[in-house]
Amino acid sequence: MAYIEFRNIRKSYDGENLVLKDLNLQVNEGDLVTLLGPSGCGKSTLLRSLAGFESIDGGSIHINGQDVTDFPPGKRNIGMVFQQYSLFPNMNVAENIAFGLKMQKMDAATIKEKVARIIELVELSGKEDHYPTQLSGGQKQRVALARAIVTEPKVLLLDEPLSAIDALLRKNLQKQIRRIQKALHITTIFVTHDQDEAMLMSDVIHVMASGKIEQSGTPTEIYTHPETHFVASFIGNYNLLSSSDFEKLTQKKTQASQIAIRPEAIEYFKEPQPRTEDHLYFKGKVIDETISGNILSYVIETDQGVHLRADHLYRTFNLLDKGARVFLKVEKRNVLEF
């Protein structure tokens, strides 16, 4: 049985336009699940409805088999971390983390023990007496995370907590959050619009669009087998082709309205290759190139005037110059039709 379950959730802010449209979603115990989608798709509204900060107009929300739809936030035993750290400026690290425990009226010895354990877990040892103004952005976010989990909630909600942090630090925090979540085995829902973040951190990804779940699956399933044109356009950097462009390339009719090909599925060669039945073959010239980290991307204009992007690990051999003639092939199983 699912640990968290959304059943036919409906939500409107103006009484007419639905932000959440009869949405159904399940989360297994101990998983880190990501709600991934563009701004305005309803992902934060869904998260806040689970926390009890937003009412719903229809449906029900269940945690561990219990209907919590009408429970106030304080009765749901949920920890939440926002993009804003919301730390108390007049309290040091230890005091900020201990705040929730004091509200639960725990004894001082238990509070001290729990705070010490969490500080070690989030790697803030030695910062106990520091105030928020003395901390970096990453340290502040770890304090906010520690404060959310020290009370041992049943569920942890993370609403774009890393979006205001620079790229390098964000990658380190992504790994730390995942490590902590696994160590505590806490059921977690993470909201982001960053596909790379979702791929790195998630057990399961739910791609959202216009108040609905477009597709659910593991990161590998979502990336390699997008079920809709929207998912293909939002995940990765697929080459998205119209049916007419694809027919130009292949000289064959297609029943699909859209075609998607991953850039890394396109192989390139300086010479023509032997043909097989399970591949498609194109010819063209290099019109642009970019390097992102260790990924080299070529933009190739085929002889039919269709632009394709081909991605590969950067190597010092088999490099192509702009204007170079190039021969492409792609396995037919990597050509997705919608």
Residue ranges and their predicted role:
Residues S44-L47, V143:
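ABC ATPase nucleotide-binding domain helices that frame the ATP-binding cleft
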Residues G59-D67:
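Conserved ABC transporter NBD signature motif
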Residues L249-F338:
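Non-catalytic connector elements of ABC transporters
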Residues L36-P38:
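The feature captures the beta-strand-to-loop junction immediately N-terminal to the Walker
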Residues L32, P73-E227:
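ABC ATPase nucleotide-binding domains
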Residues A51:
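Helix-to-loop junction immediately C-terminal to a conserved catalytic motif
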